């Protein structure tokens, strides 16, 4: 098919602008965050080392491998989460009956005695391993570790929360979340995935993702509020970070996500924090389903993919609902006020309109 020369010229200019933006803005942001991560991980590792001395069941899993830290997630340029993987989940059954969307419980297997578990004192009378009890014990240990660690002058435990959050240099916040890694199993609540008759992801990639599994996190969540208080405290949140990252390999998918995060930092830090990196990552996964061919994720398509994701985001903000990729009954906007979401949709539309109507938009962004 012949393509008009002016269309080729416009596309070439757009590719040039996006590549320039990636080099001058995105990579600079990534470099700055990498420097911050190196500093804060050194401090967090020291705190976790002290925790392990006090309580050997909490073994630090924050290790650097091929330039990245396992279990570390960047929430924003100043907020981070470290997932601390615990050992010996084996004597518990994973119960995912749908009564707690986005969460599950760990119940002592039939015929197993409490004494067979490494976590015996955190098992409830009903035989559930309590996420809240484990987090409470971990909170106490971290508070003591902060007082003893060599960096105590620059790190503090954030008060008035059951979460374990460290404030470092009065600027960075690091949440440390106890978790279990569940490999080789897949939650029933995500059994519908992948949707039939959609060519992406490839069956081999699906098998890889399901083998990778998911994590169970001990943390507070708006999705559990209003449920039975005991069940809420005992429940563990489903977390699919590694599965999501695996799906985003290939083509310019990860580059799209890096550009989206940079645009978010520079233009979408709004009152009430309606939009976070995870919303953008979720919508990127939906965009992958809409555009399943690898040719739709090359350099020439990046602008179209970004616009598609922003238009999806506007729709979600206006409908006041953003479904989780693996658990669509879970609304990622839950707890956000309509006013905050409406304001965000206007900001996203301005950003999207600029990208759609100006070939030089990325010079200004």
UniProtKB/Swiss-Prot annotation:
Gene3D superfamilies: 1.10.1410.40, 3.30.460.90. It comes from the Eukaryota. SMART domains: Mab-21. PANTHER family: CELL FATE DETERMINING PROTEIN MAB21-RELATED, PROTEIN MAB-21-RELATED. Belongs to the mab-21 family. This is Protein mab-21-like. It comes from Anopheles gambiae. The lineage of its organism: Eukaryota, Metazoa, Ecdysozoa, Arthropoda, Hexapoda.
